[in-house]
Amino acid sequence: MLRVSNLSKFYEIKKHWYLKSKKYFIFENINFSLKQNENLMIEGKSGAGKSTLARILCFLENPSGGEVWYKGDNLHQLDKKRQRLLRKEIQYCFQDQKMALNPYKKIKNLIQDGLENFNFKKNGDLIDEFFDFFNLKKQILEQKPYELSGGEATRVGLIRSLILNPSLLILDEIVSTLDIKNSKEILNFLYHYQQKNFISYIFITHQSELFYNFKYEKIKL
């Protein structure tokens, strides 16, 4: 499904105007593949490029070299229209959902906007199903992100991604800001969701001990 070949990211920086620019690599020649319904864990120290790699995989940033192939398409050679169509298949859940969600909109509108952006019809029944699955109270739909707890905001972020029925969900330090109880609950939800749906996860984390329910391959940056 996904194949990453010799992927590199660097920035060219000049320390002084009279010096030649020098390449500073975030990562270099990364290779891995991921089959449908399998998982991958990406580990590495802070600043190793984990989030940069995630952003490249979902078109938010371009690589400096190498290729990303998804279901036979070289992603960064596609035009913007085709990339946009694929965004519903490759979803990215940011680390801090309270910061990622638009603070001026109600949760109901944030979820419905996501559906409309990809030409899905508004579906209150489907939203209710996801709220039941993630054990969220329906009154949250009328609240705004700043009114939610960290665990509630993370669940809402996951619903916004999963309601599009993606094939691949990239989870960037999804439980790093949560307590152990909320972390285990959310990972348990994700585990059971995968048992019922044909989805692959890429976990970016430094807390691998919490992911004991999942089978996954691992790479380290």
Model-found features: residue ranges?
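Conserved ABC transporter NBD signature motif
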Residues: G66-L75
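Conserved catalytic motifs of ABC-family nucleotide-binding domains
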Residues: N165
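Q-loop/switch helix immediately C-terminal to the Walker
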Residues: D96, P103-N119
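Helix-to-loop junction immediately C-terminal to a conserved catalytic motif
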Residues: C58
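Hydrophobic anchor residue at the start of the ABC signature
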Residues: G157-L158
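ABC ATPase NBD coupling module
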Residues: L19-K20, L75-Q91, N117
